[in-house]
Swiss-Prot record:
This is Copper-transporting ATPase 2. Gene3D superfamilies: 3.30.70.100, Calcium-transporting ATPase, cytoplasmic domain N, Calcium-transporting ATPase, cytoplasmic transduction domain A, HAD superfamily/HAD-like. The lineage of its organism: Eukaryota, Metazoa, Chordata, Craniata, Vertebrata. It is an enzyme of class 7 (translocase). Detected in liver and kidney. It is found in: Golgi apparatus, trans-Golgi network membrane; Late endosome. GO terms for molecular function: ATP binding; ATP hydrolysis activity; copper ion binding; P-type divalent copper transporter activity; P-type monovalent copper transporter activity. It comes from Mus musculus (Mouse). Each HMA domain can bind a copper ion, they are tightly packed and closely interact with each other. Wild-type ATP7B can usually be loaded with an average 5.5 copper atoms per molecule. Copper ion transmembrane transporter involved in the export of copper out of the cells, such as the efflux of hepatic copper into the bile. Its main location: Golgi.
Length: 1462
């Protein structure tokens, strides 16, 4: 019976019957709504209409049905926030009485009503939140027990298309969540899946279809006999099969409408809405209007162009709802109210409509002249206060600023002029681009409560409606419908999270292309975007995002204008007048795909913006040349937008050298003055007057100081002037103020003394400016040298990009008709490019023809090359190792993977907050304080002088008799004031930090640690989390042979002959595994020469084959003694004559292709090595499978000790790698790391670092590869291995020269010592100022303590010397040696078990369970046989421990056996 009929008749029933009927209907509907997967489940957390009509809102069955209590095991909880999220989510479900989650026990106790909710549904709800949930042992779910064999069946499916462990995880994760699936085991090596299922809930065909929908090829291999169900089972099946029960949204809408009319609190409003075009409009209206206060329910029908809204009239009015819908972007919705609704009805909410906020633009500005934090804040304050500016961020370290602004309100030129008016030099660093944030309706953000908030914040989610024709070159217009009924294709962009490798990309593309209405799919791995062209009459963009979500990824439709458009600048020759300009501009703007064209006759340049999907740079050049002009690409310096600091380095170097040349004699004279004379009456030679009032010393001081003041100090004056222009006082202002007043005062009193013909030359302060300028200029010079290093990392990254590409024109059967060398800037999407062996892939693309191996270490960090075949994705900047290939360009310019990595590094360097020197932060308060004290001293002594002249006369040094009393008072007060200003000069404060940093970095370099400046040295002691890369960091990064096994029952050759044959065969291979095997064989044989190989063939992804001869001579020259291995098989004699061996070396597939059978014991032995993180390959000689080689990347011997030491220091340690989870777990167990992030991209590493930083932690990243460089730049301290890539070294803050991981510990230890010394220096400087300033001000004159001017200079010099001597004490630092670390770890350092290591995939924080021996695993491996037939004859220099050592230090470079070749 239709529940709506029951509900519609409520009003005609007696009160008691009506109440019972409503309860019955509510129980039925809400029990169906509680099923997982219903789109309206989350919106029904309360009873809504039932409460409002006076009925009981809860389920009546809750009180009558008995409640059950069960325990659910939950994996993946990390904090109490997880606990609260689970409790809030589950407690809101219907049928849940209560839930208590325990973080310590990793479980939840749930009390629920079985008739409404079962345990499996609860587990699924928890898993949907990102956790792993399962019923505790001994607890039965509310459906038939899984443990009953009679209710389970097993099916084996053949699954093709899996390439890595990520594919296995995706299949297992998706299928395991299906109702009726008990367990699943997917084998990558066997390309099959074994699934135990409940046949009354799901069938094998359904399982096969689900796997096919994920983008794989699946077929049923075999299945168990179908179950025969009795009458009881049939009844149970009917009651359990929840899939047959559905509730349509229309039923729910009608249901609420009926209830709404019955109650006095809710009303139902039918509306007519015009302007809706697609499902995105429906989601836009429902998602925003449904969250307004007073709106209980809303249902929008795209087909009928109507909406049914259930609302509270006391909170909201129909006119308010009409205004709210019409205010939603894009603003073209037209709402008609039903007849009878008063249009002038008062509104309870604001109906003022605000215009949609325009798209923001971001500009990056280069700002010269920023010297400290006090310069940064005024710029940010000034910009943020300007109308139209939404956000600003200034980087002191880079000298750049990012501004997000609305171009409709303020222009970029106005912003640049405003900053220049503050005294800085500004230039535009990069082109502006449009930003339109996508509104995420699933987020927990608060909903706007006013119409202005809605209009300003809600963003349109409709797909791009532009036509997307096939690229046909210039001048071709997009296809338009020829009839009114025709519809052009549309394009949408989907943001995808969770992709970890090229296999994920292939799966998404393959799966989407299976669905009707999808015309083409293009997925970018690094940027996490998918470009989909589709038929809007068949499918809509939200449905496309849902299809991707069904594959196990997070997906959301992006805004149309988030897609970057092409931008090119051309040099055009041949223009003579404005008519030429008009012809070019009009021709370009008429061309389909060109959105903007501007030609300047004076500069002969053209600026063109275009849609790269329709037209390309070469097409634009061709258009211009066709109308009679010549066009070429304007040369752009790729590093022009980076601040290289060359100008600043040059000017501060000049300032320092000038100050030093004239400052050294001044310092020498100061030392001379401090030397006491032999007799008190004797006058020093330099004190003799040349003329009355002018001594030799003062004349020399004047000459030297004048040069320093106006040459060496010129740039200080410039910086101080700019600082004062924007009303801030920094260290430059204080330095200039002190030196200028000291110089001016000294000059004035010297001139006065000469004019008065004084008998004695006065004491001057000419020695102050040279000393200050020398030290400060040196610090500024070194500072800018360090800053210049930041741009070198980006330059190194850009050097990885190819400069030219070979674009080919293809004929029939892919026959190359023409080849052309094209600059990278002119490569277009869709171009076919040829790449020869050893060349770089110039762009991201797909292989059209050819097979090869590609070195993609710049992305994955792994040295193992990856097989590329037709259809495979290649990455710009990677190396083509073997054969020539043709590829189709899919991402060019700024969309390539390499460009994305460059962008990541740029953003990391821009966003990193530099740690300012304590003196700089202090100077903002210190400068005005000292000026006030100095002024106050002047005023006070003038007053004291006029009140009691005797005080001044007593302490003023030998005033001339010709000077009046007033002049004496003024001179004395001014001298005291100058003494305060000079003695308080920030020389000691300024030297406190840089001297300690200079000594600390020098000591670090002597100990094998290169620290780039003071910021990382200061920051290192605050580090709370260290993230290690794997390959090349924790491990050596080079594969090594760990074990060599011979089969005793088939081997007929002695071990050394097998080694000679295998080594000779592999000598012709370029694969890293082949190089490792050859090196091992040479070491074991003790020779550098091998035999000869012919007919060599290497098959990418499989192995090699060849014929080997002339190995007897090698064995004869070898010092090794032959040891036959075969049981009962005599060794081959050395004098038997030359032999030729047919050799096969490779993986399982290679052996199968060559007709060799792999027995189960050999396969199990290979699997055992692979589970330990090693790569196992097989050896066949003369058609007989005779051996197996295990190869791995060994862990560095000090890695485990370094990890233990860091942990003992209270530092958290994590492993983050692009390698697979199996390998990552194997490494983590060996070195003692509990938390692992595997299969991550460079962007994932940056995001993980940012995530930890957002939690308030200081993070250090240790890596060695190009893929690590963005994370190294983002981390608070980036630490690079000295043997790593140049890019990583340039991006890092610290470089470990000796490639020793214990130096990570040493750098933190030295940082603590250095910071401690800096603090001591600052304390000494502050004590000096706190004591010296009162003395200089004359506070202690009444008790006889007087500071003469020369004493002030001497005290200032003494304070500087004391700070320098304090810093030099760091020279005594000694790095803790290895023996000390080993003694501390003795007996405490133990490897972890697999269950102690939590592995997370990509950016997914859900923990992947460690492998445990479950009952299912035991059943799966019950057929394993003994490996007694395998014996190890590896002759190792490590003696008997070789086998154990191989297991202990083994590591798999890649577990994708099918992609490894020798």
């Amino acid at each position: 019976m239709d529940p709506r009929k029951n509900l519609a008749s409520v009003g005609t029933m007696p009160e008691q019957e009506r109440q019972v009927t409503a309860k019955e209907a509510s129980r039925k509907i809400l029990s169906k709504l509680a099923l997982p997967g219903r789109p309206w489940e989350q919106s029904m957390k309360q009873s809504f209409a039932f409460d409002n009509v006076g009925y009981e809102g809860g389920l009546d069955s809750t009180s009558s049905s008995p409640a059950a209590t069960d325990v659910v095991n939950i994996l993946g909880m990390t904090c109490h926030s997880c606990v609260k999220s689970i409790e809030d989510r589950i407690s809101s479900l219907k049928g849940i009485v209560n839930i208590k989650v325990s973080l310590e026990q990793g479980s939840a106790t749930v009390r629920y009503v079985p008739s409404v909710m079962n345990l499996q549904q609860i587990c699924l709800q928890i898993e949907d939140m990102g956790f792993e949930a399962s019923a505790a042992e001994g607890k039965a779910a509310s459906w038939p027990s899984r443990s009953s064999p009679a209710q389970e069946a097993v099916v084996k499916l053949r699954v093709e298309g899996m390439t890595c462990q990520s594919c296995v995880s995706s299949i297992e994760g998706k299928i395991r969540k299906l109702q009726g699936v008990v367990r699943i085991k997917v084998s990558l090596s066997n390309q099959e899946a074994v699934i135990t299922y409940q046949p009354y809930l799901i069938q094998p065909e359904d399982l096969r279809d689900h796997i096919c929908d994920m983008g794989f090829e699946a077929a049923i291999k075999n299945r168990t006999a179908p179950l025969r169900l009795g009458p009881i089972d049939v009844n149970k099946l009917e009651s359990t099969n929840l899939k047959k029960e559905t509730v349509s949204p229309v039923q729910i809408s009608n249901h609420f409408e009926t209830l709404g009319h019955q109650g006095s609190y809710l009303a139902t409003l039918p509306l007519r809405i015009d302007g809706m075009h697609c499902k995105s409009c429906v989601l836009n209206i429902e998602g925003n209007i449904g969250q307004l206060p007073g709106v209980q329910n809303i249902h929008v029908s795209l087909e009928n162009k109507t909406a049914q809204i259930q609302y509270d009239p006391s909170c909201v009015t129909p006119m308010f709802l009409q205004t709210a819908i019409e205010a939603l972007p894009p603003g073209h919705f037209k709402v008609s109210l039903p007849d009878g609704v008063e249009e002038n009805e008062p509104q309870s909410g604001s109906s003022q409509r605000h215009q949609e906020q325009g798209p923001g633009r971001t500009a990056v500005l280069t700002i010269s002249g920023i010297t400290c934090a006090s310069s940064v804040q005024p710029i940010e304050d000034m910009l943020s206060q300007r109308k139209g500016v939404q956000q600003t961020s200034i980087s002191l370290a880079e000298g750049t600023g990012a501004v997000l602004y609305d171009p409709s309100i303020v222009s970029l030129d106005e912003l640049r002029t405003a900053v220049e008016d503050m005294g800085f030099e500004v230039s535009v660093n990069s082109e502006t681009f449009t930003i339109n944030p996508v509104r995420n309706f699933k987020s927990g953000n608060s909903v706007p409560q006013t119409m202005g908030d809605i209009a300003g914040s809600v963003q349109k989610m409709a797909p791009d409606t532009r036509g997307l024709p096939t690229h046909q070159g210039p001048g071709h217009s997009s296809e338009t419908p020829s009839s009114p009924g025709a519809t052009a294709s549309q394009k949408c962009f989907v943001q995808i999270k969770g992709m970890t490798c090229a296999s994920c990309v292939s799966n998404i593309e393959r799966s989407l292309q299976r669905h009707a209405g999808i015309l083409s799919v293009l997925v970018a791995l690094m940027s996490g975007k998918a470009e989909v062209k589709y038929d809007p009459e068949i499918i809509q963009s939200p449905r496309i995002a849902q299809l991707i979500q069904d594959l196990g990824f997070e997906a959301s439709v992006m805004e149309d204008n988030t897609v970057s458009e092409g931008d090119i600048e051309l040099i055009i020759t041949g223009m003579t007048c404005a008519s030429c300009v008009h012809n070019i501009e009009s021709k370009l703007t008429r061309t389909n795909g060109i959105t903007y064209a501007s030609v300047a006759l004076a500069t002969s340049k053209a600026h063109v913006k275009f849609d790269p999907e329709i037209v390309g740079p070469r097409d634009i050049i061709k258009i211009i040349e066709e109308i009679g002009f010549h066009a070429s690409l304007a040369q752009r310096n790729p590093n022009a937008h980076h601040l290289d600091h060359k100008t600043e380095i040059k000017q501060w170097k000049k300032s320092f050298l000038c100050s030093l040349v004239f400052g050294i004699p001044v310092m020498g004279l100061m030392v001379y003055m401090l030397i006491p004379s032999s007799t008190p009456q004797e006058t020093m030679v330099l004190d003799h007057n040349i003329i009355p009032g002018l001594s030799v010393l003062n004349l020399i001081f004047f000459i030297l100081c004048t040069f320093v003041q106006f040459l060496g100090g010129w740039y200080f004056y410039v910086q101080a002037y700019k600082s004062l222009r924007h009303r801030s006082a920094n260290m430059d202002v204080l330095i200039v103020l002190a030196t200028t007043i000291a110089y001016a005062y000294s000059l004035v009193i010297l001139v006065v003394a000469v004019a008065e013909k004084a008998e004695k030359s006065p004491v001057t302060f000419f020695d102050t400016p040279p000393m200050l300028f020398v030290f400060i200029a040196l610090g500024r010079w070194l500072e800018h040298v360090a800053k210049s290093k930041t741009s070198e990392a980006l330059a190194k990254l850009m050097s990885l990009q190819a400069t030219e590409a070979t674009v080919v024109t293809l004929g029939e059967d892919n026959l190359i008709l023409r080849e052309e060398q094209v600059p990278m800037e002119l490569v277009q999407r869709g171009d076919v490019i040829k790449v020869v062996p050893g060349g770089k892939f110039p762009v991201d693309g797909k292989v059209l023809e050819g097979n090869t191996m590609a070195d993609e270490s710049l992305i994955t960090g792994e040295a193992m090359p990856v097989t590329k075949k037709p259809g495979s994705i290649v990455i710009a900047g990677s190396i083509n190792a073997h054969g020539s290939v043709l590829l189709k360009a899919t991402h060019v310019g700024n969309d390539t993977t390499l460009a994305q990595i460059v962008k990541l590094v740029e953003e990391a360097q821009m966003s990193k907050a530099p740690i300012q020197q304590l003196a700089d932060r202090f100077s903002g308060y210190f400068v005005p304080f000292i000026i006030i004290i100095s002024t106050l001293t002047l005023v006070v002594w003038i007053v004291i002088g006029f009140v009691d002249f005797g005080v001044v006369q007593k302490y003023f040094p030998s005033p001339s008799k010709h000077i009046s009393q007033t002049e004496v008072i003024i001179r004395f007060a001014f001298q005291t004031s100058i003494t305060v200003l000079c003695i308080a000069c920030p020389c000691s404060l300024g030297l406190a930090t840089p001297t300690a940093v200079m000594v600390g970095t020098g000591v670090a370099a002597q100990n094998g640690v290169l620290i780039k400046g003071g910021k990382p040295l200061e920051m290192a002691h605050k580090i709370k989390t260290v993230m290690f890369d794997k390959t090349g960091t924790i491990t050596h990064g080079v594969p090594r042979v760990m074990r060599f096994l011979l089969l005793a029952d088939v081997a007929t050759l002695p071990l050394r002959k097998v080694l000679a044959v295998v080594g000779t065969a592999e000598a012709s291979s370029e694969h890293p595994l082949g190089v490792a095997v050859t090196k091992y064989c040479k070491e074991e044989l003790g020779t550098e020469t091998l035999g000869y190989s012919t007919d060599f063939q290497a098959v990418p992804g499989c192995g090699i084959s060849c014929k080997v001869s002339n190995v007897e001579g090698i064995l004869a020259r070898s010092d090794l003694t032959a040891h036959p291995v075969g049981v009962g098989n005599p060794p081959t004699g050395e004098g038997a004559g030359p032999q030729t061996f047919s050799v096969l070396i490779g993986n399982r597939e290679w052996m199968r292709r060559n007709g060799l059978t792999i027995s189960s014991d050999i396969s199990d032995a290979m699997t055992d090595h692979e589970m330990k993180g090693q790569t196992a390959i097989l050896v066949a000689i003369d058609g007989v499978l005779c051996g197996m080689i295990a190869i791995a990347d060994a862990v560095k011997p000090e890695a485990a000790l370094a990890i233990y030491t860091l942990k003992s220091m209270g530092v958290d340690v994590a492993l983050i790698t692009g390698d697979n989870r199996k390998t990552a777990r194997a490494i983590a167990t060996q070195v003692g790391i509990n938390k692992v992030f595997a299969e991550v991209l460079p962007s994932h590493k940056v995001a993980k670092v940012q995530e930890l930083q957002n939690e308030g932690k200081k993070v250090a990243m240790v890596g060695d590869g190009v893929n690590d460089s963005p994370a190294l730049a983002q981390a608070d301290v980036g630490i690079a291995i000295g043997t790593g890539t140049d890019v990583a070294i340039e991006a890092a803050d610290v470089v470990l020269i000796r490639n020793d991981l214990l130096d990570v510990v040493a750098s933190i230890h030295l940082s603590k010592r250095t910071v401690r010394r800096i603090r001591v220096n600052l304390v000494l400087a502050l004590i000096y100022n706190m004591v010296g300033i009162p003395i200089a001000a004359g506070v202690f004159m009444p008790i006889g303590i007087v500071l003469q001017p020369w004493m002030g200079s001497a005290a200032m010099a003494a304070s500087s010397v004391s700070v320098v001597l304090s810093s030099l004490q760091l020279k005594c630092y000694r790095k803790p040696d290895l023996e000390r670390y080993e003694a501390q770890a003795h007996g405490r350092m133990k490897p972890l078990s697999a269950s102690q290591v939590s592995v997370h995939i990509g950016m997914d924080d859900r923990r992947r369970d460690s492998p445990r021996a479950t009952a299912w695993d035991q059943v799966s491996y019950v057929s394993q046989v003994s490996l007694s037939s395998l014996t190890s004859d590896r002759l190792s220099r490590h003696g008997g421990a070789a086998e154990d050592g191989g297991d202990k230090w083994s590591l798999l470079l890649s577990d994708r056996d099918e992609e490894q070749c020798i």
